[in-house]
Amino acid sequence: MTNKKFILNADDFGMSQDYNRAVLVGYEDGFLRSASICANGPSFESAINEILPECQELSLGVHLNIIEGKSLTHCPLLTDEKGNFNNGYLAMILKSNNREFLSQTEKEFRAQIERVQAVAKPDHIDSHVHVHAIPPIFKLVCRLAKEYKIPYVRTQNEILYAVDNKKKTCTLAYGVNIIKNLLLKFFTMQNKKLLPQYGIKTNDYLIGVCYTAMMNSQTLEEGLKAIEGDNIITECLIHPKNYAIKKDDHHAEEFKLSRDKLLQDTIYRLGFEISNHKNL
């Protein structure tokens, strides 16, 4: 008997009303059962007060963000003089062994976790642009997860796969994503060794890096088909938006994915149970 769990997670909850509406409708009309909220998001209060009460069984995560928007604390190594985050991913890697940088990062992460815990009970942690995958930052996040009793931290082990769609695969963006995927897999090999020390759960596989900004029902289905084995947890990250004024972009496509009944049937047919972090 197989025990394959699949989690569809909406990142960037609280970043805008478009993201918030997508979580609500994806939960009510689709198979979205998990979302990660940005504590510094412009629509954080709306997400907490208007969306979460309508999604009683939604698994809520903390989407740690030191990449975009304003900080909750004074952390000058992470922000400009106006308090806006101003480090890219490479800068984060280069600074990640700097003691003061890690101290300021910890202070900001604590503020973000505590803001979410003040109004909800988060059960997982991930981050904006996978910044927590950088090994020194990952170790910090595991320590905080244990302290704040958050049992699950995302890792980034995505199997390299390609869909039969030249518009997606034969592109510069896909090539860049492959490089990003290889870097994240390298980090994950190191990071997973820390998990037993902190008693943290994680996913076995991730879908959503190779086709960042290109996710749809086809890319998710092919990603699941590339995964073999039983007793596994597979997480797929999406960035869905339910626009007030219609747009056709990858955010809208990912919103559509979360409500695709044929895709939902395919997930079951492939032997996966649709779950969320709180039910692991």
Give residue spans per PLM region.
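DG-centered beta-turn motif at the end of beta-strands
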Residues: 10-14
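Gly/Ser/Thr-rich loops at beta-strand to alpha-helix junctions
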Residues: 130-134
